[in-house]
Amino acid sequence: MLIVLSPAKSLDYETPPRVKSHTLPRFIDRSATLIERLRKLAPQDVASLMDISDKLAVLNVTRYADWSPEFTAANSKQAVLAFNGDVYDGLDAKTLSTDDLAFAQKHIRILSGLYGVLRPMDWMQPYRLEMGTRLDNAAGKDLYAFWGDDVTALINKDMAELKHEGSLTLVNLASEEYFKVVRPKVLAARVITPVFEDWKGGRYKIISFHAKRARGTMARYAVTHRVTDPAQLKRFNEDGYAFDKAASDDARWVFRRRLED
């Protein structure tokens, strides 16, 4: 069983990592190709392309200029410790033990516009490049064309290494934007997508902030409980969520909570 997550826009490179162990991204050459393309953009181009402020555009143009194919402790940080958004608040990787991080390294993958797919302990240099960005490139009009089958092929390879655990299942805890880079016809696995709904206004609905955090919390649950069989995820009961069998089907597992009447 392998879990995929989305990355985060917010990054933390100020807090020193509490662990030194790391691995390197496996698509560095492909990332370098994207960086070369991004370096051709002026700040105003980046602001328009990514719909961000001029200040953020300047920051990211600087990041592209500083990016190096040589990853070091001075310019990089482990991905799972560098990302700093709602999903990663739920995952709370900084409090995971060394053994927890080792399990996460085998069972969690982070989809990335720049890096394709990252393992939790892969060193990562700071960047902003969302998967849905329409950055034209030699392969086509966007990043889905750029990555093609490569991300899915690497996920297949990683899952094959877990075959001894018994379940060739990909648990999709990523957003729709990011999971679109995974190609179903190439993927050699069953896909389960957990969905988190909260009671509000007289009905259950997905509330983005809560759903993002819950995805990270479920990933943490899988790590700390050493989950290798997806059926074990039905026991997930953190923060008041519970599996709702009636609202679920084989591919879409719904978890609901009711904090208000």
Swiss-Prot record:
Database matches in Pfam families: H2O2_YaaD
Transmembrane segments: none
GO biological process: response to hydroperoxide
Coiled-coil residues: none
Signal sequence, start to end: none
InterPro entries: YaaA
Gene Ontology terms: cellular component: cytosol
HAMAP family reported for this sequence: UPF0246
Family note: Belongs to the UPF0246 family.
Name of protein: UPF0246 protein Rmet_0978
